Curated annotation (Swiss-Prot):
EC number: 2.5.1.19
Name recorded for this polypeptide: 3-phosphoshikimate 1-carboxyvinyltransferase
BP terms from Gene Ontology: amino acid biosynthetic process; aromatic amino acid family biosynthetic process; chorismate biosynthetic process
Keyword DNA-binding: no
Active site per database record: 312
Family (UniProt): Belongs to the EPSP synthase family.
UniProt subcellular location: Cytoplasm
Major subcellular location class: cytoplasm
Domain of life of the native organism: Bacteria
Source organism of the structure: Streptococcus agalactiae serotype V (strain ATCC BAA-611 / 2603 V/R)
Catalyzed reactions per annotation: 3-phosphoshikimate + phosphoenolpyruvate = 5-O-(1-carboxyvinyl)-3-phosphoshikimate + phosphate
Binding sites annotated in the UniProt record for 3-phosphoshikimate: 20-21, 25, 166, 168, 312, 339
Record SUPFAM superfamilies: EPT/RTPC-like
Protein residues bound to phosphoenolpyruvate: 20, 92, 120, 168, 343, 385
Amino acid sequence: MKLLTNANTLKGTIRVPGDKSISHRAIIFGSISQGVTRIVDVLRGEDVLSTIEAFKQMGVLIEDDGEIITIYGKGFAGLTQPNNLLDMGNSGTSMRLIAGVLAGQEFEVTMVGDNSLSKRPMDRIALPLSKMGARISGVTNRDLPPLKLQGTKKLKPIFYHLPVASAQVKSALIFAALQTKGESLIVEKEQTRNHTEDMIRQFGGHLDIKDKEIRLNGGQSLVGQDIRVPGDISSAAFWIVAGLIIPNSHIILENVGINETRTGILDVVSKMGGKIKLSSVDNQVKSATLTVDYSHLQATHISGAMIPRLIDELPIIALLATQAQGTTVIADAQELKVKETDRIQVVVESLKQMGADITATADGMIIRGNTPLHAASLDCHGDHRIGMMIAIAALLVKEGEVDLSGEEAINTSYPNFLEHLEGLVNA
């Protein structure tokens, strides 16, 4: 498709879709709790739909009237063996988190995914879940999907130091630990998004958190809840960057999630000199309205504990850095290599094709700004965040056309992204 180019200004108000991470977890907790859970503002992207379909196949009644998703929870003990393979599509979150649930079930399941998911490492969950007593391995390759998983009702507690900073691995172990008899201890390498921990408490469970240590007991009773999902800051990030780099822009983003483990992009943007203001803060839901204005930006350095707080935003931050004065360094971000694509390689190649001065490193990128971008023909590579990054980059192109292939990947997390983009350009 031909993307919008040469934007003079962006103006408007957007309500971004519900947070993908929270939507997945709300569906899972609703299914493994007793009683009814009602969820408002769920993201209805392809990844979350994979999670919904998986629990339907395991006997959970889930209704969607277009506004509210209602889940009639069955508890861990009420899940039943699916008749077919569990197809997780492109969703690594679905596969890893649901593997933690399945570890405590006595039936055998095979989980499959698309070509992209079939290249993503699963040994990071297979190893600790095997230590707990589940049998899990790749069908054709030990470390990659499809995964065959045989759970057990005799799952053992675990004491485990996470070798990578991964909220998905942590969450898989938490779901497994809830099905043990005894106390588990999970120690993070760096603090990652804590939606699973927050939601356990919302559903009536208990855990103890001290620094990077999480302790929890198995056998807890979880009870259905009413949940409102805030907007996804990872989706809002594209509009934040667009507003900062297109002259005279003024964008208002309503109901954006501001969980402290996810707001790294706000800290980085402020450090770079970006004009971004928070208002209408809701401390219960952890959401706020963000107002973004065009800004003159300075380069920065992003590494260490900051990386897990903005790992999904790094592609669009790389674009932001092409428009900042000076050299931006992104380091300690090797996790980007095992996302939907090798995001280090694909971001660097895509932006280079558009004229950016950007270099890949073993664990990140070096970006020298500021540089004008030019027309090119590009591909999403099956990665929603790459597609949206390119669409924002195209707005800076003054002459010629930007062609994007595989734009359907954007539906993974933001089905009406291109419609919202058109609204901002034509306001």
